[in-house]
Curated annotation (Swiss-Prot):
This is Cerebellin-4. Homohexamer; disulfide-linked homotrimers. The trimers are assembled via the globular C1q domains. The trimers associate via N-terminal cysteine residues to form disulfide-linked hexamers. May form oligomers with CBLN1, CBLN2 and CBLN3 prior to secretion. Once secreted, does not interact with other CBLN family members. Strongly interacts with DCC in a NTN1-displaceable fashion. Weakly binds to NRXN1 and NRXN2 long and short isoforms produced by alternative promoter usage. Interaction with NRXN3 short isoform is hardly detectable; no interaction at all with NRXN3 long isoform. Glycans are attached at N26, N85. It is found in: Secreted; Synapse. InterPro entries: C1q_dom, Cerebellin_Synaptic_Org, Tumour_necrosis_fac-like_dom. Its main location: secreted. Keywords: Disulfide bond, Glycoprotein, Secreted, Sialic acid, Signal, Synapse. Residues 63-198 form the C1q domain. The gene is Cbln4. Residues 1-24 form the signal peptide. The lineage of its organism: Eukaryota, Metazoa, Chordata, Craniata, Vertebrata. GO terms for biological process: inhibitory synapse assembly; protein secretion; trans-synaptic signaling, modulating synaptic transmission.
Length: 198
């Protein structure tokens, strides 16, 4: 009799373990990552400041909004005298990709979360006798630069790329330190994306 009671008390616990994953899988479709299946068990998890969440089962789950990418071009020449604010920020008037909308109309990328991000830029100088210098800025400080200064070449490119560790709300943009850019055929571009969140 005692063993029968013990067997009955175990049955509800076993049923709970078997039923809960089936219920959770109905709310969320599996996500395939490198040939393996990851099932998110909570369709409305509470997200912390790092973008991670914890389901009722105590499983830590990455938020699904980790897709971040932008790419923009400049369609006109860019001369510092034309910039009314005199910040020398390079503005890109045509946004080709802006997944997540984190690249602003002011041509500043604002990081939505902590992570490793990739940035690249390609700019062309306007005048043969001029040198251009472009800095990629992080929160107002230069991180990398690119130069183009061959006096015998009319259209010369300044190009660079970098991986950066960013915190949420960090701001990344391009600043023209010297010279003028050519943009009439979308020669100047600026792109970036989230490599992985932290």
């Amino acid at each position: 009799m005692g063993s029968a009671r013990r067997a009955l008390s175990v049955v509800p616990a076993v049923l709970l373990i078997l039923v809960l994953p089936v219920w959770a899988q109905n709310d969320t479709e599996p996500i395939v990552l490198e040939g393996k299946c990851l099932v998110v068990c909570d369709s409305n998890p509470a997200t912390d400041s790092k973008g991670s969440s914890s389901s009722p089962l105590g499983i830590s789950v990455r938020a699904a909004n980790s897709k971040v990418a932008f790419s923009a071009v400049r369609s006109t020449n860019h001369e510092p005298s034309e910039m009314s604010n005199k910040t020398r920020i390079i503005y890109f008037d045509q946004i080709l990709v802006n997944v997540g909308n984190f690249f602003t109309l002011e041509s500043v990328f604002v990081a939505p979360r902590k992570g490793i991000y990739s940035f690249s830029f390609h700019v062309i100088k306007v005048y043969q006798s001029q040198t251009i210098q472009v800095n990629l800025m992080l929160n107002g400080k230069p991180v990398i630069s690119a130069f183009a200064g061959d006096k015998d070449v009319t259209r010369e490119a300044a190009t660079n790329g970098v991986l950066l560790y960013l915190d949420k709300e960090d701001k990344v943009y391009l600043k023209l330190e010297k010279g003028n850019l050519l943009g009439g055929w979308q020669y100047s571009t600026f792109s970036g994306f989230l490599v992985f969140p932290l």
